[in-house]
């Protein structure tokens, strides 16, 4: 009898160790869609594209653990409703991220009333996703087109307070082993091997510090880099470019692996396609990304 009890106890200990080990956590499959742009006059096929993408995702086997819509959902609250109703037919849960077509310096409250928090975290298996509102990291409503050097405009004081609150919240989060940032506008542009950056040096395409400004609260990129460094986050899912790209960016000793999703509404750039990405995330946080084209989409 004593031997039997010892055997049972040993089995429980072994099972406990296995369940607590990283290998015991199943990998996660995340579908990222972006830039659906429902209601945009220059994207008349946007809704049809989204409906096609939803059908393709529902046909996946096995089904993804979650779907992330990384910004530029729609132009108006009516378009948001259309997008939500279309996405409601997905078998997987959907997480929304705000983009520059969703949140402006005048309508943050409207977005929150419709979608809930514009920055938050969620967990899939042992992977934590940190959703960040990139619209609180510079004024993307009043950027100066073609300005050299790139110079993002500071947020109005009332919205700057919201930015400070978000960065304070980010600083209060706990660093864990597997953590991924998600936002619409990427933290960095892509450095090209022949020189220059993609899409351009225009401050519209990435997060920048305001130049020639002594207000430390306007060091948007620096503050986010510091926050991600403290959280040991080195992977970011983003959209905004309408072009699927994977690249690594550095700032001092900080390194970030960026996975840019294609757009659902329309593509921008040579070779770009309309579609979505499927991210397979290992139990240790490694990310493998596959681009999937939207069937029959223009």
Language model segments and positions:
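Bacterial N-terminal signal peptides
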Residues: 12-22
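Bacterial N-terminal signal peptides that target proteins for export
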Residues: 2-14
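Acidic, His/Gly-rich catalytic cores of divalent-metal-dependent hydrolytic chemistry
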Residues: 283-298
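Short acidic, glycine-rich surface-loop motifs adjacent to enzyme active sites
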Residues: 175-191
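Active-site His/acidic residue clusters
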Residues: 187-208
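Extended active-site neighborhood of metal-dependent phosphoesterases/phosphodiesterases
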Residues: 78-178, 204-207, 223-231, 235, ...
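Active-site glycine-centered loops adjacent to acidic/histidine catalytic or metal-binding residues
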Residues: 35, 71-72, 99-100, 184, ...
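N-terminal active-site segment of His-dependent metallophosphoesterases
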Residues: 25-82
